[in-house]
């Protein structure tokens, strides 16, 4: 999996909470062995098309999901949060299935990811000092993710982020279908409300809560 790109968003401040989540001591993608082997096969297939996977989230400590619950109980809202969620209260995000109190990620069997065009040049970088448009805006206006335009940003709580959304362009639909097809060929199942979320049936089990730490050399 060494060639797979990573941008583990909950290990930093570029996420809907605006800070690192509990348990993310390092920006590392941790997965179960069978998940990793499947990802390796997908990456090899995509490389022949000059594409790469980019991971946004992998294993998520259970304490991080609890951190999200505590965040939702705080009624205050920031401009950064509004980039991800224009329409719903924080509490509604759980009821509508955009955030889970108990996440598949904590079993090591779920992933959030996207596609990167390896031939693309001069990809914009996220600037924490800049005011970006919300996650449904055109790609030139919303926060950059260094990846192919999938129609919304990652973690966007909006119907436009639903994998089969009708409001996206043909090109955006093509790339979503490319990602789903590549993942499906190795047994992954997409979550219909989030184009970026996939899980591997049979790889789940008990939830874990060990913190994510930097790899030792």
Sequence positions of predicted segments:
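Conserved metal-phosphate-binding beta-hairpin within the catalytic cores
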Residues: 198
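Extracytoplasmic cell-surface/polysaccharide-interacting catalytic and binding patches
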Residues: 1-58, 62-84, 88-192, 203-217
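Active-site lining segments that contact anionic ligands and/or coordinate catalytic metals
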Residues: 195
């Amino acid at each position: 999996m060494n060639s797979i790109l990573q941008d583990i968003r909950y290990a930093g401040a570029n996420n809907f909470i605006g800070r690192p989540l509990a348990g993310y001591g390092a920006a590392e993608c941790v997965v179960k062995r069978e998940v990793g082997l499947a990802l390796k096969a997908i990456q090899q297939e995509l490389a022949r098309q000059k594409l790469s996977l980019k991971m946004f989230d992998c294993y998520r400590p259970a304490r991080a999901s609890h951190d999200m619950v505590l965040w939702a109980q705080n009624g205050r809202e920031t401009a950064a949060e509004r980039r991800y969620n224009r329409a719903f209260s924080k509490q509604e995000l759980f009821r509508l299935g955009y955030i889970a109190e108990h996440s598949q990620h904590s079993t090591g069997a779920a992933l959030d990811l996207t596609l990167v065009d390896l031939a693309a040049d001069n990809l914009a970088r996220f600037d924490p000092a800049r005011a970006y448009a919300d996650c449904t805006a055109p790609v030139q206006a919303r926060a950059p993710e260094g990846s192919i335009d999938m129609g919304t940003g990652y973690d966007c709580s909006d119907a436009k982020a639903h994998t089969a959304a009708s409001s996206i362009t043909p090109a955006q639909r093509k790339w979503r279908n490319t990602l789903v097809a590549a993942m499906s060929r190795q047994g992954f199942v997409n979550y219909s409300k989030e184009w970026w979320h996939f899980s591997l049936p049979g790889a789940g089990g008990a939830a874990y809560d060990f913190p994510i730490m930097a790899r030792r050399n």
